[in-house]
């Protein structure tokens, strides 16, 4: 996904030996049929029906090379200043200032071909929302997006059949591979291996499209980058029994 692919590309570009494990399959635009019954099981955990314990919220969690960027709606805006301020004030991340983040944001925006959505691309529903926010005196804006030569087919959530969506699948993952990174799809990470207080690698299994496990995987590494999203990342930390001194992982 967005975190792992960017890290893999940057590290591979720097000359490091990089292995990427992705539980999902490596689908491409040729596989995107624009049919919900075919694409939902391919691109999402539990066919897009994963939900909270009480059933009140459905979680659209990606499961494919490219992660959630394959099925998201391509809205690309920078981390808002109030959020950066909260991270600095409440979490001690003093280096994350608006000024310090400007150059990294610009670099990513260039790589993803981020551009302003034009007024003629704003549909009637969103035009009505804009009029409503203005009438109420609320703040609102037309965001930017990372599409190139979009044909406006309307099937963003099922993967872009035209490679117009500048997802990790067509940007950072190919870049990482060109720099020598090895991307292993259908490879589920089950546990981060720790010995003598240091991370030594990742242990997992090969899985098929239905999630049925096969052969074992054992990757030895000096550094492990965990980039499995808001749900799978804490789950893997808990299963590995690491990085939870605070007791807040997964809460």
Placement of each model-derived feature along the sequence:
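N-terminal Rossmann-fold NAD(P) dinucleotide-binding loop
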Residues: 4-5
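Glycine-rich NAD(P) Rossmann-fold beta1-alpha1 loop
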Residues: 1
